[in-house]
Regions:
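N-terminal nucleic-acid-engaging modules of covalent nucleotidyltransferase systems
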Residues: 2-175
Length: 175
């Protein structure tokens, strides 16, 4: 006699859902040594003033601080005429450009009053155009906006946020 295997009775199928753990949203970060336009885009994308200030603190570098001072300090007088600059944008992909604002930061003093007043106006403007042509178009746009004090028109960053993020900056008395 062959015995047939008996089937085990099935248990009732009541499924109890496990509580879902909410993961904290991963904070997007920038690559090491980010370009100034990447930093400003990231800071602008932050929703709160506190988050913007923290982002400015985290990604502080000399080029960023110089651009922000040029833009927000009313005593910094640009020696480059206001308005659009006739230059040919660099069409190289970002990162393969001839230069970056981090490298050009040390030459920005040529373009403000008190920096290199002995420089001929035409030579100064030629140097400015050459610098812009070596930069990625996004960084060149930032320099043009900063020279006219119009950075806040394109990026959601205010003087108060910069002042809070960088309390060591002495504002005023530069010209």
């Amino acid at each position: 006699m062959t015995s047939t295997p008996q089937k085990k009775p099935r248990k009732s199928s009541t499924v109890v859902a496990k509580p879902v753990k909410k993961r904290a949203a991963k904070k997007p970060t920038l690559p090491p040594n980010p370009f100034v336009n990447e930093i400003l885009d990231y800071v602008s994308s932050q929703k709160s003033k506190i988050a913007k200030v923290e982002a400015l603190k985290e990604y502080r570098n000399d080029a960023l601080v110089s651009i922000l001072i040029w833009n927000f300090d009313e005593t910094v007088i640009s020696m480059i005429p206001e308005g659009d600059v006739p230059f040919t944008p660099n069409d190289s992909p970002q990162g393969t450009d001839h230069t970056s604002l981090r490298r050009e930061q040390r030459n920005l003093y040529h373009f403000v009053k008190g920096g290199n007043d002995a420089l001929n106006g035409i030579r100064r403007e030629t140097m400015f155009i050459q610098m812009l042509e070596g930069l990625h178009p996004s960084e060149a746009r930032i320099v043009i906006l900063a020279k006219d004090g119009r950075l806040s028109e394109e990026y959601a960053i205010t003087y108060e946020q910069v002042k809070e993020a960088y309390p060591d900056i002495q504002w005023g008395g530069r010209s």
